[in-house]
């Protein structure tokens, strides 16, 4: 027998935490706006927004939020844009560790941190040509919460 589990996008009754970086705020505010609108469209009424200085600081906040057991999911939003130094690689690498926290705590942690080569690419992904990755991250969070409830 084959059983297929497929979650819907009904977020009614869910609690989400959005952790958003202040660094590159002109990008991250667009991501946050997209995420909050997406949550609203999917019936989510309970969202806590936590602002952190930058993407590098996210993992410890994600860990604390996950350990609190207050939220059904955690969505991370940020923008790391490549510069002329190795700083991009360091920050991108550290922020990528966020996913392991979700596995450790059995909570969906959605990675909505843009890692781009140029400012233009980041702008495109924050609500222009390439859609809004914040909105996509929020929809993914709703779906993952529902999927985990089916397991």
Swiss-Prot record:
GO terms for cellular component: cytosol; riboflavin synthase complex. Its EC number is 2.5.1.78. GO terms for molecular function: 6,7-dimethyl-8-ribityllumazine synthase activity. It is an enzyme of class 2 (transferase). 5-amino-6-(D-ribitylamino)uracil binds at residues 23, 55-57, 79-81, 111. It comes from the Bacteria. NCBIfam families: lumazine-synth, PRK00061.1-4. HAMAP family: Lumazine_synth (MF_00178). Belongs to the DMRL synthase family. This is 6,7-dimethyl-8-ribityllumazine synthase. It comes from Leptospira interrogans serogroup Icterohaemorrhagiae serovar copenhageni (strain Fiocruz L1-130). The gene is ribH.
């Amino acid at each position: 027998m084959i059983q297929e589990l497929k979650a819907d996008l009904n977020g009614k009754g869910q609690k989400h935490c959005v952790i958003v970086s202040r660094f590159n705020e002109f990008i991250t505010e667009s991501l946050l706006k997209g995420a909050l609108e997406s949550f609203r469209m999917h019936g989510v009424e309970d969202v806590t927004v936590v602002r952190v200085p930058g993407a590098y600081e996210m993992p410890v906040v994600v860990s604390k939020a996950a350990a609190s057991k207050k939220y059904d999911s955690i969505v991370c939003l940020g923008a790391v844009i490549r510069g002329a130094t190795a700083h991009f690689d360091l920050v991108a690498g550290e922020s990528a560790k966020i996913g392991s926290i979700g596995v450790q705590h059995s909570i969906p942690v959605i990675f909505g941190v843009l890692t781009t080569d140029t400012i233009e690419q980041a702008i495109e992904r924050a609500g222009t040509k390439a859609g809004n990755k914040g909105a996509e991250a929020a929809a993914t969070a709703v779906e993952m919460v529902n999927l985990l409830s089916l397991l």
